[in-house]
A protein has these predicted regions:
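Sec/Tat signal peptide C-region and signal peptidase I cleavage site
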Residues: 17-23
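Bacterial N-terminal signal peptides that target proteins for export
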Residues: 1-10
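Exported/periplasmic ABC-transporter solute-binding proteins
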Residues: 23-50, 54-56, 61, 65-71, ...
């Protein structure tokens, strides 16, 4: 075989192998509230000799819409149960998936705002009245935003809070509105409130979980997902992953 032909053959073979490897890399869509916990879980997954996965963070609603329109996500780590079940109904996933965690809603306040958080309704009214803006995730896209509105209405705080609300595409962005001072108060996941970046700038208060629908976070595997996505799906249900989730404030099944 002439040398130039051999070189072309080897180069073509290299391209084919590279494309095959890239095509098999799992792409995981992860709800923003899971960012810190998922990062640690992913590190643990790789430490067991598994291949790296590509990770994208955002809102469960946006991810669902993107998957419906052909986005190549192999695994959705959602912040609720509605969106994964909808993907199954639309024939995108292999089944309805499983609940991997139950989230907790909290209120956070910017330390420099000087707003006291208390589970006393009187104190909450004072806090809301003092706040300039209150950040939440968009309720149609993010389960933690939906839970925040349910809480405000159930607690009788909706009328004094509604005109101060500013909406973010996901709970991670809503949280950063408070961290950066764009809002004095906000609703977020306890896992984000406990993160180093957020906790040094804010304080938080747990919201009564009886005042909003349980945030049962479900994950679902798409049809045609590569083996690595299936491996990660199984790892998320392991005792090691559950221990990490619990550390970040989640309950696990």
């Amino acid at each position: 075989m002439p040398e130039i032909t051999l070189r072309l053959f080897i180069f073509s073979l290299f391209l084919l192998v590279s494309q095959s490897v890239f095509a098999q890399q799992a792409i995981v869509a992860v709800a923003a509230n899971m960012k810190d916990a998922f990062g640690e879980i992913n590190t643990a997954f790789k430490s067991e000799g598994n291949r790296d996965v590509r990770v994208v963070y955002g809102s469960s609603g946006n991810f669902t819409a993107q998957i419906m329109n052909g986005a190549p996500f192999n695994l959705l780590i959602s912040a609720d149960g509605h969106f994964p079940i909808e993907l199954y109904r639309q024939g995108k996933s292999i089944d309805e998936g499983v609940v991997y965690a139950i989230g907790q809603l909290v209120i956070i306040s910017k330390n420099s705002a000087g707003i006291r958080l208390s589970d006393s309704k009187t104190e909450l009214i004072k806090a809301i009245n003092k706040a300039n803006k209150i950040a939440i995730a968009k309720p149609d896209l993010a389960p933690y935003g939906k839970a925040a509105i349910e809480y405000l209405k159930a607690e009788g705080l909706w009328n004094i809070a509604k005109d101060k609300l500013i909406y973010a595409d996901n709970v991670g962005i809503a949280t950063m509105y408070v961290v950066t001072g764009a809002a004095d108060l906000g609703f977020t996941a306890i896992s984000l409130a406990k993160s180093a970046e957020v906790s040094k700038e804010t304080n938080f208060m747990l919201v009564d979980s009886k005042l909003y629908e349980p945030i049962k976070q479900r994950m679902v595997l798409m049809k045609g997902a590569p083996q690595e996505a299936l491996s990660f799906y199984r790892f998320m249900q392991s005792a090691q992953a559950k221990s990490i989730l619990q550390k970040y404030g989640y309950s696990t099944p």
